[in-house]
């Protein structure tokens, strides 16, 4: 079936979120609601993908274009309602020529809407021959949702909104998901006859189904997975849906051979990749394009963002962002790896160590209480506790090079740019301002002064 157009409705404010930003720009498992829905719809390859905006229109439009710069942005005018949003979209789509074929319409506040469900909906619509099809689901508590009212033959009569329903209508548990498929000709007739005769004084898209029924049959397809069409109206619903989704994600990873000790406290975003026999301890957040290899151990209480963890590495109580941790390397506890680090095989970044754009050679160790930024270390080098690479001169970031088989004493300060050759040993408390040749000893003579019988001024 050719999908002529897909219309994503993203014009609403989402007042129940109590937020300064539009509801569709809130995030779910690492992506905005809007981009997640556009992912699902875009995979259907519609001839035109349109996004309707109104509240903070420019901000929402920019987010939509960040997904696909070819997206058609439709700005809804001051007339409220989802029906009016579709009218605006159809007017703009019509400027490209007469519409034929099939039009998909979806809300943008269903972060788990998936391409598979949409394909099944389109197939059902094609096979049924109906002029319009609504995607539905059955809820234990349908409060707040539009109810699907059917006739004796099971055909859809209408959709009744919560504020407009009587007691028998509100007792219905089958609800509208705000996803529809129309034949283009049926949709054009239906939206041309909408009115605002309802409690909200808005143009409801749901009324288009009542109008459509006058010229064609209206069918309904029940989503096989209710979670995939669950909408988010407030932060309570957001947290509930996020937890349910995350537990599913954790369960699937466990079935795939990953050990997750406590799924209740482990959060894994959708684009994370892991190999079997990886171990995730409690309290971990795995985000972005993070990859974790077999036999690596992550946690407890660790955050990985776009990080790569190679086999048999161990990352404990640390935060790692845009960095690669080599095979059998040890990170933590309480290590902060900012973007751009490469930690070599069997290397270590220990307690209270911060690194940024550091390349640590195989077998090298930065055990504790150090800052290593804009620096590279060779192999089998040991950095004493309390060492700092002073990389910033107030204007530029400068580089420090420390070679292989180097032994740096405690409390060293490297004033970049500076190069230290292979096999160097430095004394404790040294300030290294100039290059040091290989196989040398370097130390700073800081004279120690002792004042006998000293008393502070207030005791004299």
From Swiss-Prot:
Its EC number is 2.7.7.23, 2.3.1.157. It is found in: Cytoplasm. One of its GO terms (cellular component) is cytoplasm. The active site is at 368 (proton acceptor). Keywords: Acyltransferase, Cell shape, Cell wall biogenesis/degradation, Cytoplasm, Magnesium, Metal-binding, Multifunctional enzyme, Nucleotidyltransferase, Peptidoglycan synthesis, Repeat, Transferase. Pathway: Nucleotide-sugar biosynthesis; UDP-N-acetyl-alpha-D-glucosamine biosynthesis; N-acetyl-alpha-D-glucosamine 1-phosphate from alpha-D-glucosamine 6-phosphate (route II): step 2/2; Nucleotide-sugar biosynthesis; UDP-N-acetyl-alpha-D-glucosamine biosynthesis; UDP-N-acetyl-alpha-D-glucosamine from N-acetyl-alpha-D-glucosamine 1-phosphate: step 1/1; Bacterial outer membrane biogenesis; LPS lipid A biosynthesis. Its main location: cytoplasm. It catalyses: alpha-D-glucosamine 1-phosphate + acetyl-CoA = N-acetyl-alpha-D-glucosamine 1-phosphate + CoA + H(+); N-acetyl-alpha-D-glucosamine 1-phosphate + UTP + H(+) = UDP-N-acetyl-alpha-D-glucosamine + diphosphate. Residues 1-235 are annotated as: Pyrophosphorylase. Residues 236-256 are annotated as: Linker. Pfam families: NTP_transf_3. SUPFAM superfamilies: Nucleotide-diphospho-sugar transferases, Trimeric LpxA-like enzymes. Mg(2+) binds at residues 109, 233. Acetyl-CoA binds at residues 391-392, 428. Residues 257-460 are annotated as: N-acetyltransferase. Its cofactor is Mg(2+). The keyword Plastid does not apply. Binds 1 Mg(2+) ion per subunit. UDP-N-acetyl-alpha-D-glucosamine binds at residues 9-12, 23, 76, 81-82, 146, 161, 176, 233, 338, 356, 371, 382. GO terms for molecular function: glucosamine-1-phosphate N-acetyltransferase activity; magnesium ion binding; UDP-N-acetylglucosamine diphosphorylase activity. GO terms for biological process: cell morphogenesis; cell wall organization; lipid A biosynthetic process; peptidoglycan biosynthetic process; regulation of cell shape; UDP-N-acetylglucosamine biosynthetic process. In the N-terminal section; belongs to the N-acetylglucosamine-1-phosphate uridyltransferase family. Catalyzes the last two sequential reactions in the de novo biosynthetic pathway for UDP-N-acetylglucosamine (UDP-GlcNAc). The C-terminal domain catalyzes the transfer of acetyl group from acetyl coenzyme A to glucosamine-1-phosphate (GlcN-1-P) to produce N-acetylglucosamine-1-phosphate (GlcNAc-1-P), which is converted into UDP-GlcNAc by the transfer of uridine 5-monophosphate (from uridine 5-triphosphate), a reaction catalyzed by the N-terminal domain. Homotrimer. This is Bifunctional protein GlmU. It comes from Bifidobacterium animalis subsp. lactis (strain AD011). The gene is glmU.
